[in-house]
Amino acid sequence: MEQWIRSLQEKAEGLRLDGKKAELPITAQQAEELYQYMELLLTWNEKMNLTALTDPMDILSKHFLDSAAGGTLLPAGSIADIGTGAGFPGVVLKILNPEHPVVLMDALQKRLSFLQEVCSALELQDVELVHERAEEAGQKKEYRAQYDCAVSRAVAPLPILLEYCIPMVKTGGVFLAYKGPALQEELSASSHALGLLGCTVESVHKITLDGEDWEHIIAVIRKEKPTHPIYPRRQAKIKKDPL
């Protein structure tokens, strides 16, 4: 554990946002919580498909530090991780930014069972687990326009992801879309969806890690006006006819 934690803290020094060092202080307690999270992830991954990455150092860099980079872009207030899967980025953001209330939403109960164990083992406070499909949750008053920030990582192409997530963001709030280096193409295909959903791309940020050959992008999308009540549509319609 000690060697992994040292590696985490050293690699965190090499995390860069737009080429500049990302200010990512990680306390000893937070590092231990991330290690415990990783152990649970690997244990549960033996019986269910949570991650294709099984090397602890790959999990450190490609899951944990990638997820953590969005913490420098968070507004104050509540966070909803839509399609959280194994908890990326939501659990990592919660560990490193404990002051934020966090909702972890997923359509599969077995993933939420894993996340329940993680939250219990790490004694994470102010975390709500929600078993819902995003397109259904976005039409329910308890979730619609309720969050200061939504986040999502590698769930769907951006035009579809916008329809899933923007309805749950408060007017004036933001959506952080974690994407790969092909984001610019997705943004070009999303202009119609952005207009219909009442939002604009506020900024785009490149995430890199010294010594690693991957590059990820986070788009910060601002919700400027309430979403029309017809959105989100049913899943079949969203997939057949993306905005």
Over which residues does each language-model region extend?
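Conserved beta-strand signature within the Rossmann-like core of class I S-adenosyl-L-methionine
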Residues: 172-182
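Conserved SAM/SAH cofactor-binding pocket of Class I
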Residues: 65-154, 162
